[in-house]
């Protein structure tokens, strides 16, 4: 019968016993239960040991390092007896200068070279089958392992793409499975992606790099976990004259513990919630229960109705959470703002919108995302000066591109949004509208008093309409009255419950509709929600696909980029200098929507930041 080598405290000599035997004492044990856990071996020259150890430490998801042998103990006599085995099965792949040159049943012929080599003991994935069972799902045959285009963090010559394994999961079982995986496997059990394989750079699941073909039945969601077979690419990348690695599917059993082993009972900071954030391409994201609850608290805070407009009827649960999750995955964001409600004044813009947009820009900059603002062409000079002043006064870190769009056709919108007009390569991943005039069903644009301001508004709505048909571009609308771009998602409620709603309701829908008593508050809340997500260990690991080091919660650059009473007072002061008026009263002064900055807005900003940065 096949034999599984149990490696306990005598790891070095046991490895020697393992690799010098001509008997195949390794077998696939990924679904075995008990205290022992499966692991694979990588054998490298001693000179590369420190670099490979560090490479594993900065890519712990796919490469959980359990231990390594001490070179001087390689030649200790083997301890214990090896039980009867089948003969002749290969156990190792041999690598020479980065190329796999053959498979070996033993390393006996390399005993001299092994004196100056180190064996690394890498934890294999926890038992997915056990997690499936715990979540009430049937066990499935082990699937293949696919190479992604996600790069591991490079260190001293070791560089390779992440390799993943997949299981198809019914939609209604996703959260239960993810929680079971995290409970059983801790950080190692958390998936790195749920949704379209192409978001990982996997073109065909049916053609894995290792193992059997992977198939995802219709109606189920492909869920991916990091694979320890990532180590094979690392071994190849270093191009050392001689190295060895366990053949895929072959493991040894050990009682060595991962330093990041599951705690047994998950705390709210580690219990994951699963959220659907995109249908085309299919994409789910996760955040911890505690992070999600914080963001829900922000949503509740900004949802008050100081103007008694009836916005409570427009509120949709978790829109702020889903919008911020989607934004966190975006690489490039385009933000639009500007509502020329004061059509008899110059400039006609109001003080609601630009501060919220700039606050979001500031935080996206801190996250090192590409970000640009798009405005009406007639208001380009105004917004250019506002941004320049914001940089000069420290509200923004650096200048950002300010774009315009004149429209004309569906083709023009697609050409603007995509590189060379190709919908396969969008320039932006996410569009955000904050207090931006939105097109009504009759094609006009109305302020809250039902005055048509179409002559002052460029057709930026067309970009949101085009984005609906371009896979990979999501959108968010932030509004406080229902006539703002993106509020088409709640247009029926606007028509029923908002004054003049039957006329002014925006007809253009965003994927996510964030409703706030003042739209600026929605911009502040999006920035705060991103801070919460990036400080969440569960979401952060998912976002970086379990490769690379994590950043400490409350990173100083992120904290400094959050909205603050001081920065927002400066921002409103900049608008006042440029004669921008309050939306309700028309006053040029320190107020937004007829509400004074000191007391009302300052208090809201401080409350949002306090909730955001509070320790759980």
Swiss-Prot record:
EC number(s) from the headed UniProt entry: 4.2.1.48
Major localization listed first in the record, in broad terms: mitochondrion
Protein origin, superkingdom: Eukaryota
Name of one Pfam family that matches: D-Glu_cyclase
One GO term (biological process): glutamate metabolic process
Gene Ontology MF, one: D-glutamate cyclase activity
InterPro entries reported in the protein's UniProt record: D-Glu_cyclase, D-Glu_cyclase_mito, GLUCM_C, Putative_hydro-lyase
Transit peptide boundaries: 1-28
Protein's cellular compartments: Mitochondrion matrix
EC category name: lyase
Entry keywords, A to Z: Lyase, Mitochondrion, Transit peptide
Key word ATP-binding present: no
Reaction catalysed by this enzyme: D-glutamate = 5-oxo-D-proline + H2O
GO cellular component: mitochondrial matrix; mitochondrion
UniProt function note: D-glutamate cyclase that converts D-glutamate to 5-oxo-D-proline.
Assigned protein family: Belongs to the D-glutamate cyclase family.
PANTHER family in alphabetical order: D-GLUTAMATE CYCLASE, MITOCHONDRIAL
Protein name: D-glutamate cyclase, mitochondrial
């Amino acid at each position: 019968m096949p034999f599984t080598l149990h490696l306990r405290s005598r790891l070095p000599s046991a490895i020697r016993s393992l690799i010098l035997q001509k008997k195949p004492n390794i077998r696939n044990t990924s679904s075995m239960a008990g205290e022992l856990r499966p692991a694979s071996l990588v054998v490298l020259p001693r000179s590369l040991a420190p670099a490979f150890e560090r490479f594993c430490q900065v890519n712990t998801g796919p490469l959980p390092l359990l231990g390594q042998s001490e070179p001087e103990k390689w030649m200790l006599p083997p301890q214990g007896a090896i039980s009867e085995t089948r003969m002749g099965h290969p156990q190792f792949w041999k690598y020479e200068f980065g190329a796999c040159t053959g498979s070996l049943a033993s390393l006996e012929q390399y005993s001299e070279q092994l004196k100056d080599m180190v064996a690394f003991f890498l934890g294999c994935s926890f038992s997915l089958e056990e997690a499936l069972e715990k979540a009430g799902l049937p066990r499935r045959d082990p699937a293949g392992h696919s190479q992604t285009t996600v790069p591991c963090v490079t260190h001293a010559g070791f560089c390779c793409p992440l390799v993943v394994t997949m299981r198809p999961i019914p939609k209604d079982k996703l959260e239960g499975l993810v929680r079971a995986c995290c409970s059983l496997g801790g950080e190692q059990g958390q998936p790195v992606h749920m949704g379209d394989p192409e978001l990982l750079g996997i073109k065909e699941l049916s053609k894995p790099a290792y193992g059997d073909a992977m198939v995802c039945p219709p109606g189920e969601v492909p869920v991916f976990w990091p694979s320890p077979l990532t180590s094979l690419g690392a071994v190849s990348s270093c191009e050392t004259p001689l190295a060895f690695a366990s053949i895929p599917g072959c493991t040894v059993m050990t009682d060595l513990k991962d330093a990041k082993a599951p705690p047994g009972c998950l705390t709210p900071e580690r219990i994951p919630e699963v959220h659907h954030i995109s249908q085309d391409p299919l994409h789910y994201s996760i955040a911890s229960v505690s992070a999600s609850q914080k963001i829900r608290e922000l949503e509740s805070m900004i949802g008050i109705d100081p103007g008694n407009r009836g916005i409570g009827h427009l509120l949709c649960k978790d829109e702020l959470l889903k919008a911020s999750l989607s934004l966190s995955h975006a690489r490039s964001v385009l933000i639009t703002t500007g509502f020329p409600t004061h059509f008899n004044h110059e400039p006609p813009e109001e003080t609601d919108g630009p501060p919220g947009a700039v606050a979001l820009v500031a935080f996206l900059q801190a996250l090192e995302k590409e970000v640009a603002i798009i405005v009406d062409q007639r208001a380009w000079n105004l917004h250019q000066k506002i941004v320049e002043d914001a940089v000069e006064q420290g509200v923004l870190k650096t200048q950002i591109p300010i774009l315009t769009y004149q429209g004309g056709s569906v083709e023009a919108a697609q050409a603007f949004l995509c590189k060379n007009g190709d919908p396969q390569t969008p320039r932006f991943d996410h569009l955000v509208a904050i207090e931006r005039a939105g097109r009504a069903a009759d094609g006009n644009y109305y302020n809250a008093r039902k005055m048509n301001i179409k002559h002052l508004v460029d057709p930026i709505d067309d970009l949101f309409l085009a984005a609906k048909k371009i896979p990979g571009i999501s959108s968010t609308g932030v509004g406080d009255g229902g006539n703002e771009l993106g509020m088409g998602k709640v247009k029926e409620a606007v028509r029923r419950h908002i004054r003049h709603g039957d006329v002014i309701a925006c007809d253009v829908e965003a994927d996510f509709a964030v409703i706030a008593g003042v739209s600026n508050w929605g911009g502040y809340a999006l920035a705060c929600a991103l801070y919460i997500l990036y400080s969440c260990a569960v979401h952060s690991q998912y976002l970086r696909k379990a490769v690379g080091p994590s950043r400490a919660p409350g990173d100083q650059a992120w904290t400094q980029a959050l909205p603050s009473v001081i920065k927002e007072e400066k921002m409103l002061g900049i608008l006042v200098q440029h004669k921008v008026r309050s939306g309700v009263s028309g006053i040029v002064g320190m107020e937004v929507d007829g509400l004074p900055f000191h007391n009302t807005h300052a208090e809201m900003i401080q409350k949002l930041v306090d909730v955001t940065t509070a320790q759980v």
